[in-house]
Amino acid sequence: MANTIKVTQTKSSIGRLPKHVACLRGLGLRRINHTVELEDTACVRGMINKVHYMVKIEE
């Protein structure tokens, strides 16, 4: 099975750039402290890098 990573939203998306809000939605994050488990792919890593200041990552 592919490697997975856990991503948790730690800060609000209110007042953020629309592209950053779209990245959070693309990752499946909806609210603060919401955690999702995603496959560790280049696309997912790119979205995480854009919103790194709003999320916490666990490998």
From Swiss-Prot:
Q: Which UniProt keywords apply?
A: Ribonucleoprotein, Ribosomal protein
Q: Does the keyword Ribonucleoprotein apply?
A: yes
Molecular-function GO terms, alphabetical: structural constituent of ribosome
GO CC annotations on file: cytosolic large ribosomal subunit
Tell whether Nucleotidyltransferase is among the UniProt keywords: no
| SUPFAM superfamilies the UniProt entry points to | Ribosomal protein L30p/L7e (SSF55129)
Similarity field: Belongs to the universal ribosomal protein uL30 family.
Q: How is this protein organized at the quaternary level?
A: Part of the 50S ribosomal subunit.
Name of the featured protein: Large ribosomal subunit protein uL30
Which organism is this entry from? Photobacterium profundum (strain SS9)
